[in-house]
């Protein structure tokens, strides 16, 4: 199976509790935990970063489709959060609410909902994921 990214995303952490530096092909991102659990809140936490990936992918996918259709929808907003149920096995639910700056028809709404579900990160999160870790 071929890697999707040309270069690995890399991360490091030093002695400062929870502060991580994440590097990708063209930059760096600080990740941290909120102060209420011992971090300094200097960057997004891992859950926020995961949701940001889904937000960015959803917005970009919708923008491509809207532009291709020539629809007058200049701005799209998205809000995401997640919840977890740990009763028998871990179950995570992500809520994603999309709003538009213009009124859209019911037909557009139905189509854009389908397109949002087809964004690559949404499809990735809904399918089987294997994580192989080595030391």
Q: Can you describe what each PLM-predicted range is?
A:
Residues 57-58:
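Alpha-helical metal-binding/catalytic segments enriched in His/Glu/Asp
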Residues 1-52, 63-135:
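Extended beta-strand/beta-hairpin segments
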């Amino acid at each position: 199976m071929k890697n999707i990214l040309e270069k690995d995303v890399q991360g490091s952490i030093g002695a400062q509790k929870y502060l991580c530096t994440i590097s990708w092909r063209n930059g760096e991102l600080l990740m941290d935990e909120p102060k209420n659990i011992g971090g300094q809140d200097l960057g997004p936490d891992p859950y926020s970063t995961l949701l940001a990936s889904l937000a960015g992918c959803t917005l970009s996918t919708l923008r491509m489709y809207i532009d291709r259709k020539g629809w007058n929808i200049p701005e799209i907003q998205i809000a995401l959060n997640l919840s977890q149920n740990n009763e028998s096995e871990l179950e995570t639910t992500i809520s994603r609410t999309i709003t538009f700056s213009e009124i859209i028809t019911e037909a557009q709404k139905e189509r854009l909902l389908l397109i949002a579900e087809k964004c690559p990160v949404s499809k990735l999160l809904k399918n089987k994921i294997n994580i192989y870790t080595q030391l």
